[in-house]
């Protein structure tokens, strides 16, 4: 149990370090642009990070649960056929 707690502490420390690095990069990009464009740069970077996180989550979800997703798709197709052709 102690090994898991130590590993979680390491993950938290790494996440904090990664967040500081990303903030440093964003801060550097913001100061290279005119003041008028800074909010747009922040918005673009936030949207880009959001899309990356969604992509990683989707790839992980599909790769770990593809059997269940295929069964769900088959069920939806079957129910759609039943709804349109039988009812």
From Swiss-Prot:
Name of the gene = OPG096
Primary role: Early protein involved in virion morphogenesis. Participates in the formation and elongation of crescent-shaped membrane precursors of immature virions in cytoplasmic factories.
Per UniProt, subunit arrangement is: Interacts with OPG158.
Q: Where in the cell is it found?
A: Virion membrane; Host cytoplasm; Host endoplasmic reticulum membrane
Q: Which UniProt keywords apply?
A: Early protein, Host cytoplasm, Host endoplasmic reticulum, Host membrane, Membrane, Transmembrane, Transmembrane helix, Virion
Record's family?
A: Belongs to the orthopoxvirus OPG096 family.
Q: Which GO terms describe its cellular component?
A: host cell endoplasmic reticulum membrane; membrane; virion membrane
State the name under which the record lists this protein. Protein OPG096
**What induces the gene encoding this protein?**
Expressed in the early phase of the viral replicative cycle.
